[in-house]
Amino acid sequence: MEQGSILIVGVGGIGCKWSGGAHDKCQQLAELLMIDADESSFTSEHEAHCLHLDASGSARGAAALPNLAAHRLNEGIANISSLLETSELVILLTALGGGTGSGATAEIAAKSRDSGSLVISIVGIPFAEQPLRCAIAEKALPPIERNSDLCIRVSLERLAWQARHRNSDWKLGSEWIGELIEGLVTTLGRVGKINLDLMDLRTVVGRPGNATLIVGNGTTDDPDGVVKMARNSPLSEISVDGAKGCLIQVEGGPDMTLGHLNRVSEAFVSTLDNDCQVILGARASEDMAGRLRLVAVVSGL
């Protein structure tokens, strides 16, 4: 894919943090757009297109008011229309339960699909002990799912649990969000030994049923650990067992062998449906020396 045809979009405060961290890992392969009612989300450390949903400068915010955020987005959508229209793949990142992410994400997804883009939404689901945020998220999720080709739910509770084990900040995605996006973008944006492209992705996510995107990282000494990590991704409770479609990319360094590729891919697909359509890709790069990464989109769940 050509540079600029992949767009990473952060919506709301958490979404902007996630998108900034993710874009840092693949700046040469994707554009970055940040959308929020709080201007402090737009930090100078990231090269990003920004849409401020409080153009009056009154610092009104949109906390717990999704309809207000949607209204303000529609007022400013013309400012980002050309960016959406030139993107083949739009990756939306947000956390539901507040105003901006809950109100604006579905609108961005719909506008992107109307422009012909493939839309992947990654949405954070609130902690169970936040009943108001959970109620807002429950109402916001269906239109996001309807307007996305693939909608991935991320449990903030599981993300926070993993962050503690990694000594990282869940609000920054506990590193997992960045790894997930980097894996997907490099899978589609760089030439590999066995190439995957957007049509392969469309084929997989077009299957009936639910779909999800997962990533696992490890070393060439422990390919089984890569698969185990992928299966323990901090999503909502979801099993890939019996999946009907799978796009899988295995990445490694110059030391990655055909044995590594077979070990990782065969271990991952072993629990999928016997008739699962599997599309396999592989890529080697100097910066992955000694390491392996598995990126998989599974569908028909």
Go through each PLM region and give its residues.
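Tubulin/FtsZ superfamily GTPase core signature
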Residues: 1-301
